């Protein structure tokens, strides 16, 4: 990563500037227009802070199948956090950084998990980026302040190490309690996304252990119903067991600092549903199961 010199952001009185320039032009002369600066904002990242960013604190990669709309959403979300600088003592909000997941911002309709099922929704796939960032933050020794698991385990990260988000409802956030600022850098390619968290060598952990301490099964149930319009008995909803998972984060630094955190995930079981075409068929099945 290379850095170039920063420049302040200036907001001018546009109406006054145009009026002054119009006056000069209407007179058929040349001259200088008076410019009133309404607002000035200094760069978020100073040259001094940029020079302190000299090492990768932690990074993580997740992979995904090629799907045009979902890929596009992942790309947009990854780009939206690229270049974010979080000063010491400040916090990062994923929802704030990525903004509204809307068509106006380029997001497309793609599958999202709702109550354990895939349903179409604008911005499907952004959770892959928040999950990737969560794991990079864990490995960097950062303090996670907001994180929630999905309704069901996902396939692109170990169980208990996912981070779902929902605009205005569920956020992923971390607090920078390190000595120096951290800089987020994302690398998107079709089929994978990598997030690097860069910082100062003084803040690079000397030891990181992310372990799964518990992975208990929560059995699902099988329910039945009758639908006379069906031509055959069949399993209409494929359920799965739930999980209760505990993941711990243990971090050490060379100067003696330590950090420990625990993350609890409860994935609800989803019932299996078998639909019979008649009550007698259901009873026959139940009798067979008992024998």
Predicted segments, located by residue:
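Well-ordered beta-sheet/strand-loop patches within structured domains
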Residues: 1-291
């Amino acid at each position: 990563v290379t850095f170039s010199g920063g420049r302040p952001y200036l907001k001018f009185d546009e109406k006054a500037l145009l009026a002054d320039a119009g006056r000069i032009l209407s007179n058929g002369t040349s001259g200088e227009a008076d410019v009133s600066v309404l607002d000035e904002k200094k760069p978020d990242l100073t040259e001094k802070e940029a020079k302190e960013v000299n090492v990768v604190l932690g990074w993580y990669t997740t992979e995904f199948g090629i799907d045009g709309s979902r890929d596009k959403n992942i790309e947009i979300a990854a780009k939206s956090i690229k270049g974010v600088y979080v000063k010491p003592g400040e916090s990062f909000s994923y929802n704030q950084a990525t903004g509204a997941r809307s068509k106006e911002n380029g997001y497309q309709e793609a599958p999202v998990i709702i109550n354990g099922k895939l349903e179409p929704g604008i911005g499907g796939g952004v959770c892959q980026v928040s999950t990737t960032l969560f794991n990079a933050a864990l490995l960097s020794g950062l303090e996670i302040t907001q994180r929630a698991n999905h309704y069901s385990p996902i396939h692109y990260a170990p169980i208990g190490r996912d981070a779902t988000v929902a605009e205005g409802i569920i956020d992923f956030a971390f607090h920078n309690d390190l000595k120096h600022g951290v800089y987020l850098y994302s690398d998107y390619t079709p089929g994978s996304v990598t997030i690097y968290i860069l910082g100062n060598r003084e803040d690079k952990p000397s030891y990181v252990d992310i372990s799964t301490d518990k992975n208990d099964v929560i059995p699902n149930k099988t329910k039945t119903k009758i639908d006379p319009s069906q031509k055959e008995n069949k399993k209409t909803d494929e359920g799965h067991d739930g999980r209760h998972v505990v993941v711990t984060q243990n971090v050490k630094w060379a100067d003696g600092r330590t950090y420990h955190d625990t993350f609890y995930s409860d994935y609800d079981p989803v019932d299996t549903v078998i639909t019979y075409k008649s009550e007698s068929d259901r009873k026959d099945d139940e009798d067979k199961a008992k024998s």
